[in-house]
Amino acid sequence: MRDRTHELRQGDDSSDEEDKERVALVVHPGTARLGSPDEEFFHKVRTIRQTIVKLGNKVQELEKQQVTILATPLPEESMKQELQNLRDEIKQLGREIRLQLKAIEPQKEEADENYNSVNTRMRKTQHGVLSQQFVELINKCNSMQSEYREKNVERIRRQLKITNAGMVSDEELEQMLDSGQSEVFVSNILKDTQVTRQALNEISARHSEIQQLERSIRELHDIFTFLATEVEMQGEMINRIEKNILSSADYVERGQEHVKTALENQKKARKKKVLIAICVSITVVLLAVIIGVTVVG
């Protein structure tokens, strides 16, 4: 009969390696040795996560402020300044996250050399998932600002109709919006129309807001285009990563349940042993008593 012990051992080694890979995908920050490269890596990951959460909060604040300004015919300068400050903070946080992601990105040479390393794949996983979260948040911010721009344009269009300036077509309106200066935009409106001072002020304010908004959108686009492209190329890989993380988390959870069950079974086995020992002791005592009584009798 052929000795297959070596093959079985190889199978066990392969299974152990798969288990290690699964666990590596869901390694929790703080489990690495203090001062080790992994601990430093996870410290950076925690920092990025915290910054992404902070960015998300700022995006929510921006959305609320935009809704408030849209509901105000003539928003105060302080409101517009607060909105611009939020945009600046979002851009600054975006730059910070981009640099932080760059710092944990596995170098190509290192990744190629250690492609099958569990540690390398874990780092690529963390970088990929964080990058995707970042890009999704920025896409949400850009979409939100684009929608805000359209609502401002609609407010201008509505004001023009109210003031009998309805002859301005959508194309002409876009051309005037692209003029780059509020004064030029307003003078173009005044050429052939009679506009009230209040309506004129609102139109001018909306136009200035649109200009600032467009600059913000362009700057965000310039900052994050390369990262969005990279994440799009890695989209399938990131989806696999998320699937692996979920399955790995289930795997670890099942493992914890198995350990818990094993401990409970172990406790039950110990209790059974104690009960058996007690029963045996009682039986021995009874036999001794019976034998003693018989001998005396």
From Swiss-Prot:
Q: Which Pfam families match?
A: SNARE, Syntaxin
Topological type in the membrane: Single-pass type IV membrane protein
| Positions of modified residues (Phosphothreonine) | T31
Residues annotated as coiled-coil are 43-163
Task: Tell me where the transmembrane regions lie.
Answer: 276-296
Region listing for Disordered, in residue ranges: 1-21
Q: Where is this site: Required for neurite tip localization?
A: I290
Keywords from the named record: Cell membrane, Cell projection, Coiled coil, Deafness, Hearing, Membrane, Neurotransmitter transport, Non-syndromic deafness, Phosphoprotein, Transmembrane, Transmembrane helix, Transport
Localization per record: Cell membrane; Cell projection, Neuron projection; Cell projection, Stereocilium
Q: Which residues lie on this side of the membrane: Extracellular?
A: 297
Q: Which residues lie on this side of the membrane: Cytoplasmic?
A: 1-275
Basic and acidic residues: compositionally biased ranges:
1-12
Q: Which GO terms describe its cellular component?
A: basolateral plasma membrane; cell surface; cytosol; dendritic spine; endomembrane system; endosome; extracellular exosome; extracellular space
| GO molecular function annotation | SNAP receptor activity; SNARE binding; sphingomyelin phosphodiesterase activator activity
Major location (coarse): membrane
Q: Where is this region: Interaction with CENPF?
A: 154-297
**What's the family?**
Belongs to the syntaxin family.
Illness association: Deafness, autosomal recessive, 123: A form of non-syndromic deafness characterized by bilateral, severe to profound sensorineural hearing loss with onset in the first decade of life. Sensorineural hearing loss results from damage to the neural receptors of the inner ear, the nerve pathways to the brain, or the area of the brain that receives sound information.
* Quaternary structure annotation from Swiss-Prot or TrEMBL: Component of the SNARE complex composed of STX4, SNAP23 and VAMP7 that interacts with SYT7 during lysosomal exocytosis. Found in a complex with VAMP8 and SNAP23. Detected in a complex with SNAP23 and STXBP4. Interacts with VAMP2. Interacts with SNAP23 and SNAPIN. Interacts with LLGL1. Interacts (via C-terminus) with CENPF. Interacts with DOC2B. Interacts with STXBP6. Interacts with STXBP3; excludes interaction with DOC2B and SNAP25. Interacts with STXBP4; excludes interaction with VAMP2. Interacts with STXBP5L.
- Protein name in UniProt: Syntaxin-4
Give the species this sequence originates from.
Homo sapiens
